[in-house]
Structures are given as C-alpha cells and as structure tokens.
Amino acid sequence: MEDRAYDDAFVRIGHERVPSVPGGTHWGGGVSISARDQARLGQLLLDEGRHGGQHLLPAAWVRQMRQPVAVAPYYGWLMWLNRDGRSFPAASPEASFMLGAGGHMTWIEPAHDAVVVVRWLDSAATEGFMQRARAALRGG
C-alpha cells in the first residue's frame, strides 16, 4: 500500500498546492497560522501597530479596531471586546480578543501587558482557564 499521508495534507487551489492541516493551523475564516504567529499578531496589536521600532500599522487604526461598532457594542473591527465585562468576566474591560474556529483565541490583555494564545479550548473550559491565567498574570 502506498503511503499518501503527506500528499493528502495538501489541496490544489488553481495551480497552487496549499496545506490543509487537520489538527492545528486553521483559525477563523480560513487563516492558516501557527500559535507563535497568533501571539506575534496579538503583540503587534498590543503595541499599537509597532514592531522593531517601526509602525507596521497606524496606531489610530489599531485603536479604532478596539472601538465598538454601533450594531454590536461587544465587537470592533475584527476584534471581540470586553468593555462591560460580560463577554469574558475574568478579563479586564480593556481586553480584546481574536476568536477563531475550534476554540482558538488570541487574548490581548493591556492591563497586564500580555498576550495569551489558546488553541482548541473547549468553550465550557474558557472561563476557568481565563480565571487561572489572569491570576497567574497578577502573580497569584
């Protein structure tokens, strides 16, 4: 029997082979990203668009991403917000989140200058995880 595991890990879109990796890199609307890159993106947003002393995104744009939209006060520009503390009670009101399919989350927590990345978290475990993470960030 021929071993096709690696051949089957790719799909062809047009004339290009694209990885289709079960169990790890899909996030949100088809974004393929590692946990490390998720953290880097979160850090870029925590740092108001700066990286390595340069602005990669305008700071005003990043701030606007965290402003609630009129029809959904818990949502900004591709960011979930926690202003009233109801979405994620364990997080600060300044926290924002990028949430993806399968429990993938990038939690941007300015109150502790922290970015927390979670992958494949069962939604029933989210609040407990966040309580423990916030306690660890507080040093207790």
List each model region and its residues:
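Structured C-terminal helix/loop/strand segments within mature extracytoplasmic catalytic/sensor domains
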Residues: 97-140
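Structural helix-adjacent loops and short alpha-helical linkers that scaffold large soluble proteins
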Residues: 49-57
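Active-site-proximal alpha-helical segments within enzyme catalytic domains
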Residues: 29-50, 104-120
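Active-site Gly/Thr loop motif
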Residues: 6-25, 63-115
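Extracytoplasmic/secreted proteins, especially bacterial periplasmic and envelope-associated proteins
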Residues: 36-40, 60, 128, 132
